[in-house]
Amino acid sequence: MESPVELLAALPALVTALALLLAWLLLRRGAARVPAPESTASDEAPGAPAPPEPPESCAPEPAPEGPSQSERVAEPEESEAEEPAAEGRQDEDSDSEMGPPTEEPEEEDGAAFSFKYSPGQLRGSQYKKMMTKEELEEEHRVQKEQLAAIFKLMKDNKDTFGEMSDGDMQEQLRLYDM
């Protein structure tokens, strides 16, 4: 009777240990990709297992250039700390380091950043910064068409939505900056 209960109690600890092990393996495998071009520069014992792994991961390496740089940062930390818990924290740190660098160039290159414009699909106030004057006019035109269609549906279905006066319409237009 106690055996299943003990197993259920130990299950979260086992899952956590498994997650830490997987994170450590992924971090180690990612760090093994980085030394492949620099194998002549580093002849340390931790680098010795790396040469067999690069042939498997040589093809995907050129595509993710940004994450490999953050993995280079994570590699020295890995050699300093040997505990799985510490390496789990390093994995979280490397994930947080990988996220912002990919987002920052998009924000910094706001003027140079190109996107496929499709009227009526943008949300928020950032679209005003990203669009040309013609695109802004097109966006406002599409918004007006959409609001006109909404108001027409509301007038056609008075029993569902209730009466809508001209003042109500003007107030709605004011909310949409129209």
Curated annotation (Swiss-Prot):
Claim: Protein biosynthesis is one of the keywords in the record: no
Keywords associated with the record: Membrane, Phosphoprotein, Transmembrane, Transmembrane helix
Gene name, Swiss-Prot/TrEMBL: Mxra7
Modified residues (Phosphoserine): 79, 165
Record field: compositional bias (Acidic residues): 76-85
Keyword set includes Transmembrane helix: yes
Protein name (database record): Matrix-remodeling-associated protein 7
Compartments (UniProt record): Membrane
Origin organism lineage: Eukaryota, Metazoa, Chordata, Craniata, Vertebrata
Compositional bias (Pro residues): 48-65
InterPro entries: Mxra7
One Pfam entry name: MXRA7_helical
